[in-house]
Amino acid sequence: VLVDPATGRERLGPPPEPADLAWLERWWPLSPGRRAEIGRTRDEAWASVLGRLTRGRAIAVDYAHPVDNRPPCGTLCGYRDGTLVPPIPDGSCDITAHVALDSCAATAPAGRTVTRLTTQREALRALGLTGARPPIELAHTAPREYLRALARAGEEAELIDPTGLGGFGWLCHDIG
């Protein structure tokens, strides 16, 4: 699909390159009338990042979707001032698409990487975030501390909510 940058009007373009068709076949199998965002160049960029790391952890975080549950109409969308708008590439909005983190995961160099796909909820809970409210007794003995702890609990709960930010996919590659 080609998009007019001024109007957002779409029209069919030429067939994808063979490498992009191969990526689609493996990572986003399509039936007629469906659409996808080709992630081959993103996967190549991620592989390049991993190839430069000699030791450490590379983390990618995104809404994500697995190969067995790709959205039938793609995920391309636009945002302006935090509001969802049509993805017209005229510079008036940010344009984004969800990442096929499973395809990125497959780019890891064999033998020198530990790869994990998880959710933000699970990753942050493993780091000790719980979103648990402080004991109510603290409100009586140390009200300011209670309010700080309550605010922190609310922030943590937002980060790990599985229907919100906690549903983000996390791809972690440990190298070295």
Question: Where in the sequence are the language-model features?
Answer:
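Conserved beta-strand signature within the Rossmann-like core of class I S-adenosyl-L-methionine
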Residues: 1-14, 55-63
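Long, Lys/Arg- and hydrophobic-enriched amphipathic alpha-helices
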Residues: 18-176
